[in-house]
Every structure is written in structure tokens, then in C-alpha cells.
Amino acid sequence: MNSPSDLAGASLIDALFGVKLSQHARLITIASSQDSALPQALVAERFTGREAVNELFSFDVDALSTSTDLDLTSFIGEELTITLLQPDGSRRAWHGLCTDAAWLGADGGLARYRLHLQPALALLGLRRDSYIFQDKDARDLIGELLADYPQVRHSFDVAQALAVRPIWTQYRESDLEFLQRVLAAEGLSWRFEHDQEGDEPAEGGAAQARHRIVFFDSQAALPATPGGDTLRFHGVRASDTDDAIDRFAAQRRVAANAVSISSWDPAQLMAPSAEQLTSLDIGEMPSLSIYDGSAERRHDNKAFADAHSRVMLQALELDNKQFEGAGAVRRMAAGHGFTLTQHDSYADGDNSFKTLWVEHEARNNLEPALGEALSRLTGLAEAGAATLLQFSDE
């Protein structure tokens, strides 16, 4: 027998939506990336997410349904798409594999589920192996490693020469840990890009994800922030036609500022070496050098030693000066560049930045009546939308 609260909740939902919950004209939507039907009609209530350079993205989506017993296994491994309405009326999409699905409770005929989305690259963290790769550079090694994961799309934007190594050793570590170690050793970074409406479908068809990982080096030109590379420093108002950053502040840290490396090569009876000293303004700090001579046959010649020492120094310099901000910018993307305008402290020529990480928070624009019902039936408090950002100008 239904309780009075169940009947009241069902009546309210029917009055607001009819038979099914609707995603029509919502700020946030959720759907299957491959056009397969979800188990039941779902409405995205809210989501939080983080995407960063050299990091797996992660999104948690709270979704509502009139069904209280959805089969959670039907979500696992499914690629889902979140879209967020932009100021110009277009939609920005993120695609991720559902790696965790949970039922959070139900009351009054309305159930809440939480879906955790990650990139297909997260699958590499689930396989552990020991393996020897011979006579390969990093690009060839990565291609061989990812060949075992047809879901993972990848591309390279690398101009620097990559040394062919006689042996790469994966030892009792996951494929993801090994991949990250190889990339770090070569000074390569990575970011994710998501297919948007109108993009050509992936060549691999439905077997491949609708997001891809891009491996890039320090010489690569970062793409502009989606929707335009100019962002305003301005108060956030509901009547504005574009989003804005309303908090932006610099921070500096003490860090090592020099690198010295060498690597013994018994075939040449010598140790190719290199040194690098930062050219950044580090205040009154003395030279603080990191020396690394641990690896054998790491560099065939001084040119490769110089290149390796440069990327090591660039990694140290990244922490020298960064910026953090917040606002209501719905199009921020990690690994993309932008120009900040209307800020008194950053004039033209000194206002270009690269986004290192961004945290998203958004809640759907549900009707006031349903918002009150959710607060009453499930104890939710009202929350706004915000974005936390981190940038670098180096």
C-alpha cells in the first residue's frame, strides 16, 4: 500500500511533468553518448566535476527518476554525455564512462541516483602488468600500450625529438601508472577533448569513446578556450549575455630553480650532461639546483641531455607563479588558453593564461515547485553554481 507521502509526491510530479520527467529546456541534460536508451527517463539534478592537465577527469551527476529500482548494472561501462547550456544558446558536452552508479534514496515517488563518470583512460588503471618494450620511442610505446584499449582515442601534438630507448620496463605497475611515468620522463603533458555537436564521428564508430586524450609537449600551441579565447573580469549578473570571472589572484611559491643532469654511457665511455638555470624572477632566492645522475644510458648525446634538462626545469618553474580564480564561466577547459580582459592589474600583453585545472558545479533550473518538493522530500538545501579555476602564465 502506498503511503500518503508517496501519493502526495507522485501527484506533485505528475502535475509538474506528466507521466515522465522531462529534460526539455533544462540547463543540464544527461544522455547516452552512443544514442542507446537509458534504462528510464532521467533528469540531471546537478553535477560536480574536475578536469585538469595530466589528470583523469571526474564528474559526479545526481539524477532524478520516477523509478525507484533502476538496474544499476545497466549504467556501468556505458558512456554518458552531460551537456550544459551556454550563454549563446549552444550546449557544451562532456562524455565519460560510467564507472560507478549508486542509489541515494527515494521519497514521495521520486528517486535520486548518483553516476560517476571518468575517461576511458581510467580503464588502464585496472590492469597491472610487468612487460619489456624494446627499441621504441615514447610515441611508439604509447601506441602499442593503447592498442589493447579500443575505447581510448588519442592523438599527438609533439614537435620535440623523442629518443628511441633500447628498453622500457613496466614492472608490477598498472598500465596507467606506467603510461604516466613514461610521459613524465619525456616531458609530455596530456589533456582531454570532448566531441561537440556537429563534430565528425570517430573513425572507430561506437566502439570508441566520444572523448580523446591529446599528448602534447611544451612547444605545442594550446587551443583557445571553447567559445572564444577572451574572458571578462566582471561581476556575475543573471542579465549578462556572457559569463565572467569575478575572482582572480596570483600566488608565488619557493621552488628549486636549476637543474643539473648526467647519465653514464659505457659504450661511449662518457656521461653526456647538461645544466639549466631559470630565467624567471625568483626574488632574492639563491640558486637551488636539483642534480640527477641516477640513470645509465639515458642520453645518447648532449643535445638530448639539454632537452631533458629543459623539460625538468619547466616542470619546476610551473610552481613558481600561478593564479587562482572563480566565477560562472561555463566554457572553461583544462589545457586551453584564454585572455583576461577588464582587469586593472593585467594589461594587454600581460593577460594571457593557460588553464591548469577547473572544477565545475552546476544545478539544474528545476521549477520552483519541484525545488521546494525536493527540499521537503529529500532534505536538499538550495545551492548555486560556481567554477573554481587554476591558471598559469608561464
Regions found by a protein language model. Give the residues of each.
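Amphipathic alpha-helical and helix-coil boundary elements used as assembly
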Residues: 1-394
